[in-house]
Amino acid sequence: MSTLAAGVFVDWEELTGQSKFVVELISFPVFSAVAGLLTNWTGVLMLFWPVEFRGVRIPGLHVLYPYLPRRVQVLPTFSGDGRRLGFQGFIPARAEKMASICVDKALLRIGSPRDFIHELDLDGVADHIAETARSRTPEMVDEVMYRENPDLWKAVPRGVKQAVYQRVDAQLPKLCRRAFDSLGDNIDQLIDIKTFVIRYLRQNPEILKDLTTTIAEPELKFMVRIGLLGAPFGLLLALYLHVHDSIPVIGWIPAWVIVLLASAAIGVIVNVIAVKMVFEPGDPQPRYKYLWRQALLAKRQPQAATDLAHILAYQVLTLPNLSEELLEGTNGDKTRQLIERLIADEIHRQLGPTHSVVRAAFGARQFDNLTVGAAGAAVGLAPSLAEDEKFAREQAAKIDDFATRKLRMLSPGEFMEMFYASVEQDAWLLYLHGAVLGLGVGAVHLVLFGW
């Protein structure tokens, strides 16, 4: 080639005593490997960090934002209100979509909310609640009675009050067990598992980051290392440039243009190879279709399933979270109505033939409201599930074991569909990022080694 291997700062031919061809045979593979490593390393970072959107406010952006195409608006480069330009990791930015995929592709395939709740020791949970409530039985009874009919309760002799406390205390285990049996049988109507998981993961995007970095840690490291594949592509580029000028028509294109285009292409190619090898195909394929036959993550399905189940059990589908969703979630009113009905039935059963007399003493309205007040007091016991960490972890272990078994039973294709679907939408951004970085590295090479 007629051009010299002389950069802006150094004449490499003179310095090394080698021809331009030899200099390029060494420099292009090195730079291409660096470009590949840099592209894939930063690409992995872009998947998860930052967890929260970081950017700067751009005057007038909120006026333009509504008119941008939807595909542009959902890019992680814009804040949700369209006022700031910056960046948020792909996975945290897609928390709602990923949560939806997690439910559709994983949770609902391995079991319904009823299946999960019945894996818990419901009798044990009920007994735990009853045991916790026993220390508060007088307080609960007093709270309800003073609220509904304070004059009557003040007039009741201490001995009678003690008898009421003891009667309620004695019936707590049975009442709690019946309540949890009923909750378990009606859980599908009381918990919208998809809405719950989506809302929870949207509020806690760091769990999504932990989920992916824990499950796919070996594959993420592989994605970075495979950036070194840029080296052989760089070698091919050096060999091609040696004959570029002799090729008709194409040889008219300046060599520096070829270097920039090839560098951008290498940045894209190593990214594509990394993503494909990690996520595709789920089920084993012939080598003439995929040289690696099966996605690397799919080959580790047993361990990946264990990691996924552990995170779901100990961070998402925990007993405190499920309790809070039951009582404070979108269907919390149904749960309260169920508890009220159970308590009302129990009061009527306990009072027996004295029911009409007591109802008359309380007043019809106050007596009926008693069941509502009692339900509210019972709901106040729910935080005790979160306070007893040992008990909560014992129940989480049951969910962990159940989810692990079920996730391992999924076909590799079904298992991988959940993970690939979560990054597929934004894969083109990773490829664009690879092209830009590759272009930058190619430009640096031209400055250092000439064109």
Identify the residue ranges that each predicted region occupies.
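Large intracellular
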Residues: 4-216, 253, 257-422
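Short, charged low-complexity intrinsically disordered segments located at boundaries
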Residues: 131-139, 227-229, 242-245, 337-344, ...
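Core alpha-helical transmembrane segments of integral membrane proteins
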Residues: 228, 232-248, 252-272
